């Protein structure tokens, strides 16, 4: 398991007790943290301790601005107190008398940690006056006046209460991150005020908070609403371009050694102050922690370190799949004489504020979900950050004193590879789930919905196509009864479709654990240390073997069931190199899904089907009902070809139980693809062609114009003709005419496959013979 957090240096060797347990070390750090807060804090009206923030000088003005305007934009540097103090001010000014003050955050971690902080400052129990709601965790009550939540939770609120009658103020925080859900909330709130519904509260206020964003554009979107600027108190930050990455290295992320070296140089040559390092994900972070620890252990603090007050380096990782308790450690001050180094994902750039940071190391990259039009799927890719994100990162070094930011990349990389602003998620990811939500809110014309930045029409049509394939909408683009049921599930539509199919066959027990496991982060721990790596791989192979060794979906079900039935699930996870936090989340997801299925099956018109066959076949047939878009057929060697009309080549991921068994397979379905040196299918199981034969035509038989529900009278005839022609051309390019489909069906019987393979081997043998004859003649 990971050894971090850990202290490298001579400080731990000074302790008479030897190595203390991690729990005792945390207890001491917690005591230091509490004492430090009590010493530096000031008493608020609620009697808690609140540090000073720039927003405090603007308190009266900002409260009045909220009173005077339906929409208000609040901007200020990270650390100005927007997130924690403004909701308190509005509560103390009486806004909560008419409903809750709802504050959205793009990340679950931020929603929970900020709610804990505000509850502490207001001296109340978390879940009473101050609460939070995130996916699968509602820590609020009837008493709750300030509710922090993810933007997705607010969207769910709107589904049940389109007029937001339970709220007096909605605060959309971290708007500059431009998440897909936040952008949809922009449009829904604008429509709510435009339509002047008789059920809408007249006193509902909307506040949009942003650290860096195109503020004039946002103001114009909300009817030229005022912008309230909170003057910052950032100290000067010196920036240094280290020139270790240039424009030609845009796709090269093998920069960990360089980042560790820069971090170590800071520790040796700079005066006291904590370090914040930005990397893209868990693997990079854990590897960097390991390398940094090895280097820091060899330091002679009597001769190598410029600041003689330093005795060691406390190394702390920070990424999304860590437990809440693990993430809390980064906020605690280090022991005397110890420099803290937090190695984090982008979560520490805006959502979390860590005191004491004086040095920032900016790796220049971030993991980002992008839609791949060639594959028709969302792909998690490592891409350069934007200039606005880079400024956010450097600003972390100037919150409490002057600081320094070390940028790994060059100035040319800054100018040529980094966009000015974050590309909104709505312009680069799948819109399937949000389009279904809009349809369920009776917003049928999703193309002309009021978007701050309208997405590419192709993405909207792709979403409509996928919803039609799942039977969530009909041929006219109207939501079906199934679609209304699907929107209640916290799952992607295709996975929801598979779960509902299983419920109709009365075998949901087979699918629910798998759906729960697929809805949490990757459960497998893959350590960096080679020795531990071999042990982890062996344990994972054993788990796959218990599932039959030929179905990654079934492996997830085995992990779920075995962990849940063990007497000590956390210990079981540790032994098998599985993330206990992810399993714990999966247990909660499964319970929620089971309750949703129970209510669904109580409906009088819920369809019931029967199927006689072994369990493993029923499971795979149910998966086909939702995943038929992700069907692939083996083509040449170990390569598979997708059947969605694009014919994209994919390879089975090395982590799959089916890796190196490709020659035994003909047809597969997969959960997702990863793009590295190749396009990999991840979480795979074999299927039979006859299971998807009747489903594959649905990938091609649809009319984009009908599905979009565009008001036909408002579309000029020539525009409709161009649209129809474009669709016809696309179908011709993709080769998806009915004749082709019929040919495909004829090609896919066992005899045709066998004959085709024989012809391929014959041609290959002939080419080899010709090549050999040519060489002989040349010789």
UniProtKB/Swiss-Prot annotation:
Coiled coil: none annotated. GO terms for molecular function: 3'-5' RNA helicase activity; ATP binding; ATP hydrolysis activity; RNA binding. One of its GO terms (cellular component) is spliceosomal complex. It is an enzyme of class 3 (hydrolase). ATP binds at residues 76-83. A motif (DEAH box) lies at residues 173-176. Residues 63-231 form the Helicase ATP-binding domain. Residues 263-442 form the Helicase C-terminal domain. Its EC number is 3.6.4.13. It catalyses: ATP + H2O = ADP + phosphate + H(+). Residues 1-28, 737-779 are annotated as: Disordered. Residues 13-28 have a biased composition (Basic and acidic residues). Pfam families: DEAD, HA2_C, HA2_N, Helicase_C, OB_NTP_bind. One of its GO terms (biological process) is mRNA splicing, via spliceosome. SUPFAM superfamilies: P-loop containing nucleoside triphosphate hydrolases. Keywords: ATP-binding, Helicase, Hydrolase, Nucleotide-binding. Belongs to the DEAD box helicase family. DEAH subfamily. PANTHER family: ATP-DEPENDENT RNA HELICASE, ATP-DEPENDENT RNA HELICASE DHX40-RELATED. This is Probable ATP-dependent RNA helicase DHX40. It comes from Homo sapiens (Human). The lineage of its organism: Eukaryota, Metazoa, Chordata, Craniata, Vertebrata. The gene is DHX40.
């Amino acid at each position: 398991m990971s050894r971090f957090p850990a202290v490298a240096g001579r400080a731990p060797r000074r302790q008479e007790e030897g190595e203390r347990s991690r729990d005792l070390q945390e207890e001491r750090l917690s005591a230091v943290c509490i004492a430090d807060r009590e010493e530096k804090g000031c008493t608020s009206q609620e009697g808690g301790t609140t540090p000073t923030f720039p927003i405090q000088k603007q308190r009266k003005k900002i409260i009045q601005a909220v009173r005077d305007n339906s929409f208000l934009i609040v901007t200020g540097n990270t650390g100005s107190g927007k997130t924690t103090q403004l909701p308190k001010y509005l509560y103390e000014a009486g806004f909560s008398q008419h409903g809750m003050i709802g504050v959205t955050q793009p990340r679950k971690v931020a929603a929970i940690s900020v709610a804990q902080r505000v509850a502490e400052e207001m001296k109340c129990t978390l879940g009473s006056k101050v609460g939070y709601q995130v996916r699968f965790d509602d820590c609020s009550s009837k008493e709750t006046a300030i509710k922090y939540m993810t933007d997705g939770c607010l969207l769910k609120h709107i589904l049940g209460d389109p007029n937001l009658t339970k709220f007096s103020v909605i605060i959309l925080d971290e708007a500059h991150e431009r998440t897909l859900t936040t952008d949809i909330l922009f449009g829904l709130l604008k429509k709510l005020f435009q339509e002047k519904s008789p059920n809408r509260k007249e006193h509902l206020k909307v506040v949009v908070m942003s650290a860096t964003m195109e503020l004039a554009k946002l103001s114009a979107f909300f009817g030229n609403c005022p912008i309230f600027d909170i003057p910052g108190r950032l100290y000067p930050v010196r920036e240094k371009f280290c020139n270790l990455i240039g424009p030609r290295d845009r796709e090269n992320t093998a920069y960990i050694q360089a980042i560790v070296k820069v971090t170590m140089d800071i520790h040796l040559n700079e005066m006291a102050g904590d370090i914040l390092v930005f990397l893209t994900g868990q693997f990079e972070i854990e590897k960097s922690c390991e390398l940094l620890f090895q280097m820091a252990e060899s330091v002679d603090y009597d001769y190598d370190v410029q600041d003689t007050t330093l005795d060691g380096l406390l190394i702390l990782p920070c990424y999304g799949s860590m437990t809440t308790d693990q993430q809390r450690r980064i906020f605690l001050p280090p022991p005397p004489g110890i420099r803290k180094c937090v190695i984090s994902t982008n979560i520490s750039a805006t959502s979390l504020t860590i005191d004491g940071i004086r040095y920032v190391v900016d790796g220049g990259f971030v993991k980002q979900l992008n839609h791949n039009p060639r594959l028709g799927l969302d792909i998690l890719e490592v891409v350069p950050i934007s200039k606005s994100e880079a400024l956010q990162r450097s600003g972390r070094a100037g919150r409490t004193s002057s600081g320094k930011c070390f940028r790994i990349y060059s100035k040319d990389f800054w100018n040529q590879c980094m966009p000015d602003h974050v590309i909104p998620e709505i312009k680069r990811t799948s819109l399937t789930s949000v389009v279904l939500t809009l349809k369920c809110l009776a917003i049928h014309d999703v193309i002309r919905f009021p978007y701050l930045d309208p997405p590419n029409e192709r993405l909207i049509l792709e979403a409509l196509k996928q919803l039609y394939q799942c039977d969530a909408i009909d041929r006219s683009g109207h939501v079906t009864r199934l679609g209304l049921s699907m929107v209640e599930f916290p799952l992607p539509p295709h996975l929801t479709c598979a779960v509902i199919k299983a419920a109709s066959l009365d075998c949901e027990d087979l699918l629910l654990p798998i759906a729960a496991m697929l809805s949490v982060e990757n459960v497998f721990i893959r350590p960096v240390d080679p020795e531990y790596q071999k042990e982890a791989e062996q344990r994972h192979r054993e788990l796959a073997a218990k599932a039959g060794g030929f179905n990654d979906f079934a492996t997830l079900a085995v992990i779920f069931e075995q962990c849940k039935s063990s007497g000590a699930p956390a210990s079981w996870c540790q032994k098998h190199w599985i993330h206990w936090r992810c399993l714990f989340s999966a247990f909660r997801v499964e319970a929620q899904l089971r309750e949703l299925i129970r209510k669904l099956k109580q409906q009088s018109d819920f369809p019931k089907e029967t199927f006689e066959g072994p369990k493993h076949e029923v499971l795979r047939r149910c998966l086909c009902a939702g995943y038929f878009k992700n069907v692939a057929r083996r083509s040449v060697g170990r390569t598979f070809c997708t059947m969605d009309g694009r014919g994209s080549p994919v390879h089975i991921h090395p982590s799959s139980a089916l890796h190196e068994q490709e020659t035994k397979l003909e047809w597969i379905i997969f959960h997702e693809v990863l793009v590295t040196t190749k396009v990999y299918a991840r979480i795979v199981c074999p299927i039979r062609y006859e299971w998807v034969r009747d489903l594959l035509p649905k990938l091609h038989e649809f009319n984009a114009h009908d599905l979009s529900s565009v008001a036909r009278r408002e579309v000029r005839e020539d525009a409709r003709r161009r649209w129809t022609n474009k669709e016809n051309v696309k179908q011709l390019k993709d080769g998806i005419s009915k004749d082709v489909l019929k040919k495909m069906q004829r090609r896919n019987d066992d005899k045709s496959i066998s004959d085709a393979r024989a012809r391929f081997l014959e041609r290959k043998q002939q080419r080899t013979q010709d090549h050999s004859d040519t060489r002989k003649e040349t010789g």
